[in-house]
Amino acid sequence: MTNIKSNVTKKSLHPRNKHTGNYDFPALIKACAELKPFVETNQYGNESINFSDPQAVKALNKALLAHFYNVPFWDIPQGYLCPPIPGRADYIHNIADLLAITNEGTIPTGKKVKGLDVGVGANCVYPIIGNREYQWSFVGSDIDPQSIKMASFIANNNPSLKGIECRLQKNEENIFKGIIKPTEFFDFTMCNPPFHASEAEATAGTERKQKNLAANKAKKGHSFQEMQNAKALNFGGQKAELWCEGGELAFILKMAQQSREFSLQVQWFTTLISKKENVAELYKELEKIGVKTIKTIEMAQGQKISRFVAWTYQANVNL
């Protein structure tokens, strides 16, 4: 059994992340004119947007995807999760480093590398970034038909995106079964699991974010680090995106249990974990079912620390 925990020594994004520093609003507006009406000069004389305005946040996301990833068409239905692009990119880049461990230290690129995004959502952001940065192929799964419809529309209507397929999970109790085909192999899976245990808990969480945002309103607000501190980009979200019975812990334990059936079809299973105390519980479950190697990778964005746990059933993985 090999257990490794990474150490965060600096409060910054991954070195390959394109979103370090402040936003270049003139360049973003050039890529997406829809952003222009939302850009304003704050009290410090810096260009910014009102991060409490969901339409402004969506326009910023559209501009970031158009400018950095050559994805000119992107949209989400009203009420669906609008994720922070820089943080999503960090997960992808750290997975690339993880894949290098089992590829003689070299990050594998190209369409033969295949990832599964569990809970792709309507936004399709993880497949977009992974496809454009490393040319990986993706399957995105979701239990929500509208999410699959929109994510597929995004993937099929941007010429720069190649090899992204979205599949509907018809059984809410299954995570991998019904999605991974019998002869399919994935280099990795990834997931941003539902955080809350009920709709009421999710609503209360949204209200807390709004209060935090109001408290931070006097800050500059134009850099990614400041944006993360304000927790401004998780507006909206459908049931499947925000909560499930038992919350995050129940979901990731189910994922661990169900991963065993696909131990020969997936090289690395990974999942984000928001609640630090849930990491130890996941480790216990993985050790109980015979996982050979477990690794925790921490990521830092400003004052915010996030993490994902990766595991593989392969023996003799040299971490």
Swiss-Prot record:
Keywords: Cytoplasm, Methyltransferase, rRNA processing, S-adenosyl-L-methionine, Transferase. InterPro entries: METTL16/RlmF, rRNA_lsu_MeTfrase_F, SAM-dependent_MTases_sf. Gene3D superfamilies: Vaccinia Virus protein VP39 (3.40.50.150). Disulfide bonds: none annotated. It is found in: Cytoplasm. It catalyses: adenosine(1618) in 23S rRNA + S-adenosyl-L-methionine = N(6)-methyladenosine(1618) in 23S rRNA + S-adenosyl-L-homocysteine + H(+). The keyword DNA-binding does not apply. The keyword Secreted does not apply. Signal peptide: none annotated. GO terms for molecular function: 23S rRNA (adenine(1618)-N(6))-methyltransferase activity. GO terms for cellular component: cytoplasm. Pfam families: Methyltransf_10 (PF05971). It comes from the Bacteria. One of its GO terms (biological process) is rRNA base methylation. Its main location: cytoplasm. Its EC number is 2.1.1.181. Specifically methylates the adenine in position 1618 of 23S rRNA. Belongs to the methyltransferase superfamily. METTL16/RlmF family. This is Ribosomal RNA large subunit methyltransferase F. It comes from Aliivibrio fischeri (strain MJ11). The lineage of its organism: Bacteria, Pseudomonadati, Pseudomonadota, Gammaproteobacteria, Vibrionales. The gene is rlmF.
